[in-house]
Design a protein with these regions (language model features):
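Hydrophobic alpha-helical topogenic segments used for membrane insertion/localization
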Residues: 2-26
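A short loop-to-beta-strand scaffold at the N-terminal edge of the catalytic core in hydrolase folds
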Residues: 46-56
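Conserved HGGG/HGGXW glycine-rich cap/lid loop of the alpha/beta-hydrolase fold
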Residues: 54-100
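Active-site loop/oxyanion-hole signature of alpha/beta-hydrolase fold enzymes
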Residues: 92-132, 308
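Conserved hydrolase catalytic core segment
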Residues: 126-170
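Conserved alpha/beta-hydrolase catalytic His-Asp/Glu region
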Residues: 193-253
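Conserved loop-alpha-helix segment in the C-terminal half of the alpha/beta-hydrolase fold
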Residues: 256-294
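Catalytic active-site module of serine/aspartate enzymes centered on a nucleophile-bearing elbow/loop
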Residues: 284-317
């Protein structure tokens, strides 16, 4: 009996060691190309960690907030920044838990991001700003604006998450998944499987782009690198997202919005028209525009159309 226990413990230790080495190899491979260079920007010392950001151009302030996803970063805006900065002082940031920002071991809640956006605009930008945001990040952007009337001059959203998807709450099963992802070795391994090159390639081809032939290897490498920076600690954000802690209903906030609110949607996206209708039914002042030949991230697939649409909206408001 004791011999069997020793064999089991030995095999368990060998398995754990092998998985740990595999995790470290994945980390090293992801960092090898160093596409996301931190020296190109600055760090905002926030209460929960250092937040990577950039500031470029001159003119009225415009803050770009990438989609809330462990694979995302401000690199999401790489194809539109140079053109937007011709007319605006453009700020980008890597949300906490993403990209080059710190990825602390904590529960990432929707309100955490409300606080981050509020503090960054007040302490670093220092004046009312227009905000261009993407997908899941619509929730905390709208809530931050609703809670602080002097924060934003206008909001533009690329393919906002559906109101129904934001109304999901956590449960026991989701909490178990959160705990699994937070485990030191096996949790990192599970996370690495979820953000593998194969998984990212599938996401880009099926969800992110309408025309897969436009996907560049450098773009894929940047997303892969973002997911694995800081020893794959993006798993803590993923753990909280799996448990729906980053979700929050925004219907009440959408109804009360007093700043110009503009939805930019992809015709090739799933349920784009129906999604827009749920927003406009709550607030008739919301404006919408549809872009063709793109899916989830038009800022990457049709950047010129996005820049033209954003500039036109900001000039009119």
């Amino acid at each position: 009996m004791k011999k069997n226990i020793r064999h089991f413990l030995l095999l368990s230790a060998l398995a754990a060691g092998s998985i740990h080495l595999l995790n470290r190899f994945i980390q090293a491979a992801a960092d090898m190309k160093n596409i996301l260079k931190a020296e190109n920007g600055n760090y905002y010392d926030w209460k929960n960690g250092k937040i990577y950001y950039t500031k470029r151009g001159n003119g009225s302030p415009l803050l770009l907030i990438h989609d809330l996803d462990p694979v995302s970063s401000s690199y999401e805006w790489c194809k539109v920044i140079r053109k937007l900065e011709k007319n605006h002082t453009v700020y980008t940031l890597d949300l906490i838990g993403c990209g080059r920002s710190d990825k602390p071991f904590l529960t990432y809640t929707n309100y955490l991001y409300v606080q981050l956006i509020t503090d960054f605009i007040r302490n670093d930008i220092g004046e009312k700003t227009a905000v261009l945001t993407s997908n899941e990040s619509v929730s905390f952007t709208v809530l931050a604006c609703n809670m602080n009337k002097d924060l934003m001059s206008s909001i533009l959203v690329l393919n906002p998450a559906s109101l129904k998807s934001l109304h999901i709450t956590t449960n026991k099963y989701a909490s178990v998944k959160k705990t699994l992802f937070e485990l030191p070795i096996i949790g990192t391994f599970l996370y690495n499987l979820r953000v593998s090159n194969t998984s990212l390639n599938k996401a880009f081809r099926e969800d992110y782009y309408a025309r897969p032939q436009l996907i560049s290897s450098k773009l894929m490498d940047a997303y892969y690198e973002a997911a694995h920076m800081n020893f794959s600690r993006g798993k803590y954000l993923m753990a909280s997202m799996e448990a729906n802690y980053t979700k929050n209903s925004i219907e009440h906030a959408v109804k009360k919005l007093e700043v110009p609110f503009y939805l930019i949607l992809s015709r090739n996206g799933k349920d784009a028209i129906a999604n827009a209708d749920t927003y406009t039914r709550l607030n008739s002042s919301i404006e919408t525009v549809y872009l063709s030949n793109c899916k989830k991230y038009p800022q990457l697939e049709v950047p010129d159309k996005v820049v033209e649409t954003v500039n036109q909206f900001l000039q009119n408001n």
